[in-house]
UniProtKB/Swiss-Prot annotation:
Alphabetized HAMAP family for the sequence: GMP_synthase
Function description: Catalyzes the synthesis of GMP from XMP.
Start and end residues of each GMPS ATP-PPase domain: 186-376
Positions annotated as active site in the UniProt record: C75 (nucleophile), H159, E161
PANTHER family assigned to the protein according to its UniProt record, in alphabetical order: GMP SYNTHASE [GLUTAMINE-HYDROLYZING], GMP SYNTHASE-RELATED
Keywords, comma-separated and alphabetical: ATP-binding, Glutamine amidotransferase, GMP biosynthesis, Ligase, Nucleotide-binding, Purine biosynthesis
Domain of life of the source: Bacteria
Protein name: GMP synthase [glutamine-hydrolyzing]
Ranges for domain Glutamine amidotransferase type-1: 1-185
EC number(s) on file: 6.3.5.2
Length: 501
């Protein structure tokens, strides 16, 4: 097993995912967790938002002194090893984003060109290596980008786990097989069976209620839990009035065709919109929706004598809500995580909590879920409430539904929907001047957003052909009453998040 020590990096679970892609089992622990070293073949120390010289900065685990195997230390992990072994780290100019580095010959860089672009995210830098270490990569600004003692420590200042690092997957696989001499012995089926066993042990003969949206996350969670407890699972679809066009009807149709499950549809449109009246702050909107969601489920659970609530929370939700560890920096709360009310009368089960979106899709395919569900674009739990910037009203929701529908329909028409990871429209809280007919118009602005990603932790804006964007913009301004201008968002993640709120 490869143990990943999480120092609060947004990418810690991504390291685990890269390892699992190589069919090697991996788990994540925190620095103060107890560990059975007899099961550990290699250790990876993650990055983190702290400085090693801060008074309360996370330290090496207590068990690390006893561990004698290979270590890959990334970003903060590299600086921690350097400091602990007598080297020097100090505040630098910082390197962020895509950076060119020059590599030296080393087993971890086997099969990789001498110069590659990597993903940096650090303010501190190593200025002196510990005795016995030598640099094996230097950045274009002269900063030590990687080092090793040639025995058991390999240190990388950049993040090989993110897709923006060229040959990052190869570096991780080189560490696993060239350095650690591990063997491939873990499959996605092992993960599925392990999760089904865990769900059976957790829920037993009790009943569970599942928050079904019809998206890939909740659908995979539903099938997993159904495999474990059968008819003791009640799937509840809540129409909170924040859905896309025709979404409720589509979900009902699909699940009646493909799944032999108890499906209950709750019409809660009025109560959600009433709660959101006058609210403009995005965090408040998310919290309100999360709390109201749980109230709906608690009411429904009482009708079915249910003790457990199942949610399709995935790991990118957890990370952005800073629920993965005390050193992680919070980005925003998700209604499946930070939006939950503190006093919940149901026991929470989140079978996908440690998986990224692409892993969830692989699990879904393994379980035999139809491609039209598996390949559906991600949709936030709070729905269109976080795509209507500012106060949510029926009028704004209807405008956004139509604009979003046209954008997606246009992408499908040109066979482009499956070429982007996520695409949607956002209604901005501003109006702009325009001309319709021979008259002055003063109408809303719609932003179109499309990104390419693998796991949702990083994303690049999609280079959709101009003629497709032009067609979508023309249709929206022509067919959607109240919209006079369409813009296209060309911001990547980071610095932006994928959703606007």
């Amino acid at each position: 097993m490869v143990l990943v020590v999480d120092y609060g990096s947004q990418y810690s679970r991504l390291i685990t995912r890269r390892i699992r892609e190589n069919e090697v089992y991996s788990e994540v622990v925190f620095p103060d967790d107890k560990v059975d070293l007899s099961k550990v073949d290699a250790v990876i120390l993650s990055g983190g938002p702290r400085s090693v010289y801060e008074e309360d900065a996370p330290k090496l685990p207590e068990w690390f002194q006893e561990y004698k195997g290979p270590v890959l230390a990334i970003c903060y992990g590299m600086q921690l090893i350097v400091k602990e072994l007598g080297g020097e780290v100090r505040r630098g100019r910082g390197e962020y984003g895509r950076t060119l580095v020059e590599l030296s010959r080393d087993p971890i860089f086997e099969g990789i060109p001498e110069k590659v672009h990597v993903w940096m995210s650090h303010g501190d830098e190593v200025v002196r290596l510990p005795e016995g270490f030598h640099p094996i990569a230097v950045s274009e600004t002269g900063v030590i980008a990687a080092a090793t003692d040639g025995k058991r420590f390999w240190l990388l200042q950049f993040h090989p786990e993110v897709h923006h690092t060229e040959y990052g997957d190869r570096m991780i696989s080189n560490f696993l097989f060239n350095v650690c001499k591990l063997e491939k012995n873990w499959k996605i089926g092992d993960l599925v069976e392990e999760k089904i066993r865990h769900i059976k042990e957790t829920i037993g003969n009790k009943k569970a209620i599942l928050a079904l949206s019809g998206g890939v996350d909740s659908s995979v969670a539903a099938v997993l839990v159904h495999r474990a407890i059968g008819k003791n699972l009640v799937c509840v679809f809540v129409d909170h009035g924040l859905l896309r066009k025709n979404e409720r009807e589509e979900v009902e149709r699909v699940f009646k065709e493909h799944f032999d499950m108890n499906l209950v549809v709750v019409d809660a449109r009025k109560r959600f919109l009433e709660k959101l009246r006058g609210v403009t702050d995005p965090e408040k909107k998310r919290k309100i929706i999360g709390e109201e969601f749980i109230r709906v489920f608690e009411e429904e659970a009482k009708k079915h004598d249910v003790e457990f609530l199942v949610q399709g929370t995935i790991y990118s939700d957890v990370i952005e809500s800073a629920a993965s560890g005390k050193t992680t920096a919070k980005i925003k709360s998700h209604h499946n995580v930070g939006g939950l009310p503190e006093k919940m009368n149901l026991k929470l089960v989140e079978p996908l909590r440690d998986l990224f979106k692409d892993e969830v899709r692989k699990v879904g395919k393994y379980l035999g879920i139809p491609d039209r569900i598996i390949n559906r674009h991600p949709f936030p739990g709070p729905g269109l409430a976080v795509r209507v910037l500012g106060e949510v009203t029926e009028e704004k929701l209807e405008i956004l539904r139509e604009a979003d529908y046209i954008f997606i329909e246009t992408l499908r028409k040109h066979d482009y929907y499956d070429k982007v990871w996520q695409a949607f429209a956002v209604l901005l809280p501003i109006k702009s001047v325009g001309v319709k007919g021979d008259a002055r118009a003063y109408e809303y602005v719609v932003a179109l957003r499309a990104v390419n990603s693998v796991e949702g932790m990083t994303a690049d804006w999609s280079r959709i052909p101009h003629d497709i964007l032009d067609e979508a913009a023309r249709r929206i301004t022509r067919e959607v009453k109240g919209v006079g201008r369409v813009v296209y968002d060309i911001t990547s993640k980071p610095p932006a998040t994928i959703e606007w709120e």
